[in-house]
Amino acid sequence: MLWGGHDSGALELRKRASGAFALRGRFPYNKAAVLSDGGRTGRPRKEVMASRAFAYRINKRDEDIHLLVGHSYDRPLASRSAGTLDIRDGDDAVTFEAQIAPEMQEVTYVRDFLGGMTAGLIVGLSPGFRIPPERAVPDAEKVEEEEPSQGMALIRTIFAALLYEMSLVTRPAYPETQIEARNWTPTEGGLVVPEGPRSGLNRTLNRWRA
């Protein structure tokens, strides 16, 4: 599972007369997220979700999608299957509204989440997704080099992805394992070259042989 992120503060929490909380959020398309600044010697890496990149599973109403705290399925807030998550796809963004019932508010991690969000500590929205198999979607992604006038980053644009969950986080974060799980190999023309299934193993063996 890959994690994306947009630290936008586009989250809104309101309490209804019933005692339930209504949580609304918005994840924008076509906005570059900086996954890595490249460190001292590397190149920055950015990721862009193209318009309606998450449309497939969102538009299939029988596909379950979860709203989680920190990408943990042990800390769910809402889901489609439970009837507590309404998520919609649009040209400019994915939007959702979740209902957090009074009973859920008594759960420790939910209470902690509500406290953190009310205090302004939880402002990030991060999708959990997978890239579909190449046999199903041949051109799901591409990697290009940034215009020299704008910088030297590698930019990965995702056109189709399978969305499984949205997570509320303190800020979107990208561990090194997450960054390396992505394909960052451009061709001379700037398009991605899919790596073979043994490419990671071959790179490791080559390092030991050197």
Show the residue positions of the predicted features.
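Signature of dsDNA virion morphogenesis modules
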Residues: M1-V192, R209
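Enriched but not universal
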Residues: V193-A210
